[in-house]
Amino acid sequence: MDHTIVHFEIPADQPERAAKFYRELFGWEINRWEGSADGGGGMEYWMVNTVPTNADGMPSRPGVNGGLMRRMMPGQTPVNYIGVADLDEFVRKAERLGAKVLMPKSPVPNMGWFAQLSDTEGNVFAIWQNDAKAGAEGQMAGEKAGNAR
């Protein structure tokens, strides 16, 4: 695996205003995620497509798609998500190298797992692992075989 950026998140005080800004500036397709608020743990979330997607929601040409969400704390900055094959392994490796876990391994149901960390300089980043079974019964963060958490 290349360990490339696979997703980004932009926090906004007024997500609707930010969505309008990016739509008009770059022509991005931005739509409120169906799992938002009611099914997304109360978090308001918009999917941002900077490039077209295929039937699975993956970019159909080079580019990175992401999300836009309501800012949850003052000073919250954009976060890049780096794809890995084994999230648990990379969280352990990052900690050995001096990273701090800010949000432990968490599922995005039917999509994958993520953890947010800060690097040795205090920059926030996230690690992402695709897994269509994430969040399913028996597949919560503490129940997956080999889980570091």
Regions found by a protein language model. Give the residues of each.
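Short glycine/proline-centered loop/turn elements that form peptide/ligand docking sites
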Residues: W33-D38, P107, A134-G135
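Vicinal oxygen chelate
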Residues: I5-D13, V64-E95, W113-S118
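Short acidic/glycine-enriched loop/turn segments that link adjacent beta-strands
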Residues: D38-E44, P74-Q76, V108-W113
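N-terminal beta-strand motif that seeds the catalytic metal site of vicinal oxygen chelate
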Residues: M1-K20, L25, T77-I82, Q129-R149
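Conserved active-site tyrosine of GNAT-family acetyltransferases
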Residues: A18-Y22, A94, G122
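Core segments of cupin and vicinal oxygen chelate
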Residues: D2, E9-P62
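Charge-dense, helix-prone N-terminal extensions
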Residues: E24, W28-E29, R92-L97, L102-P104, ...
